[in-house]
A protein has these predicted regions:
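Tryptophan (W) side chains
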Residues: 41-43
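Hydrophobic N-terminal alpha-helices or hydrophobic patches in metabolic proteins across all domains
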Residues: 54-383
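Short linear sequence elements within intrinsically disordered, low-complexity coil regions
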Residues: 26, 33, 52, 381-382
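Compositionally biased regions
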Residues: 4, 37, 48, 57-58, ...
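N-terminal functional modules and adjacent low-complexity/disordered segments of proteins
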Residues: 16-18, 46, 288, 374
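Residue-identity detector for glycine
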Residues: 2-4, 9-10, 16, 24, ...
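Low-complexity, Gly/Pro
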Residues: 9, 31, 38, 48, ...
Length: 383
């Protein structure tokens, strides 16, 4: 026996306080928890009584809840700004479903999360989070007076997306950042496309679709004359507002394709293929819709288009979903198309302590957004 640390059960006394050892900490030149060489080593690694206080492997619930709350507040603030265009623009009414699906994807990813890794220095991430508040505050301020300005929507969405990646990295290191990226990426499907790009895409695809529809009508024995994106038949002229639903079918098909890709667990390459196939299918179905509307107008007159317009658009959505689901079932049978997801390791290393500070920073910054916006406009009105 002796008076060293081994005789006191691996504890050191320092003015009445106890210093606890952690696995991996070096004491007397040897890491705690590693098997030492030699028979007479006083701290056998296999004997738990010599390790009175090891690092807990159970996840830190407080850190986890801070992680959840910070992410929730960020995305709720974004969805609150996007809700205006979801409600006023029928092209983006599918946006109401995106938060629900994104939450499901995040919950699914959480149940299969890998073991977290300790990130390196956390202060650069905290500085980056603080820096992201500047563009987010600017976009939030402008959207208060111009709620339909889509570049500001994307600026705000980009800041929220980047902040979410930083939070995931702080909580579980690079493994969590990679694992949860798709859940954050999917939520961006709710953001409207830039207006100029949307108008250009709609116009170009409508021109091509009108030409194809005119060719099909002429091949079927129905005289059709195409002028730009208008189709003239014997009963009247069908304009783009009658024959093309804009980008609704494209964004909704893209959303469904991304959702099925996660549901079936496809690899990245097959998810991209599924998304492209969904967009192509939506466009071909849109041409079929033009053809159906022309035939309906020829049988019942131009006025009947009001009765066929919305049902035809709804049919496109259902057919697109059915096609993507059938294609997903077929792709699932291909060898190597899917990735087996394993349940989350229990217990796993605790999340990094820096996530608590970062989450508090995010919560405070997000709470300041409406306050600074209101203060700004009150100050401007007082001038």
């Amino acid at each position: 026996t002796g008076s060293g640390p081994a005789a006191r059960g691996g504890r050191e006394r320092n003015h009445g306080t106890k210093t606890r050892f952690a696995i991996g900490e070096k004491r007397h030149g040897v890491k705690i928890g590693t098997a030492p060489r030699g028979r007479n080593w006083p701290w056998p690694a296999h004997n738990p009584r010599y390790l009175p206080a090891v690092m807990s492997s159970a996840p830190d619930r407080r850190s986890t809840w801070f992680f959840f709350v910070a992410l929730g507040v960020l995305w709720i603030a974004l969805f609150y700004r996007l809700a205006f265009i979801w409600e006023t623009d029928d092209q983006y009414s599918h946006g109401w479903m995106v938060p629900v699906f994104a939450a499901w994807i995040f919950a699914r990813r959480w149940s299969t999360r890998p073991e977290p890794a300790r990130p390196g220095r956390t202060w650069p991430a905290a500085v980056a989070l603080a820096a992201l508040w500047v563009p987010a505050a600017g976009a939030y301020l402008i959207l208060e007076s111009s709620p339909e300005w889509r570049p500001m929507m994307w600026l705000l969405a980009g800041a929220v997306f980047a902040a979410s990646l930083l939070l995931a990295w702080l909580a579980g290191g690079a493994p969590w950042r990679r694992h949860f990226t798709f859940a954050f990426f999917f939520a961006l499907a709710a953001v409207p496309w830039p207006y100029d790009f949307e108008q250009w895409l709609t116009l170009e695809l409508s021109l091509i679709g009108a030409r194809i529809t005119g060719i099909l009508l002429n091949l079927g024995g129905i005289l059709a004359h195409v002028q730009g994106n208008n189709i003239e038949i014997d009963v009247g002229v069908l304009g783009v507002e009658d024959a093309c639903s804009g980008v609704r079918s494209f964004q909704s098909s893209l959303m469904v394709a991304l959702l099925f890709g996660e549901w079936f667990g496809f690899r990245a390459g097959w998810r991209i293929f599924l998304a492209v196939a969904g967009i192509v299918a939506a466009y071909l179905l849109n041409i079929a819709r033009m053809l159906v509307l022309c035939l309906a107008a020829r049988q019942g007159g131009i006025d009947i288009l009001d009765q066929w317009h919305d049902p035809a658009g709804f049919a496109i959505l259902l057919l697109s979903m059915a096609f993507l689901f059938t294609l997903s079932l077929a792709l699932q049978k291909l060898p190597g198309a899917t990735v087996a997801l394993s349940p989350a390791p229990v217990p796993g290393p605790a999340p990094a302590a820096g996530i608590v500070t970062a989450a508090v920073l995010v919560l405070a910054a997000t709470a300041l957004l409406p306050l600074t916006t209101e203060s700004w406009y009150r100050w401007r009105e007082s001038l």
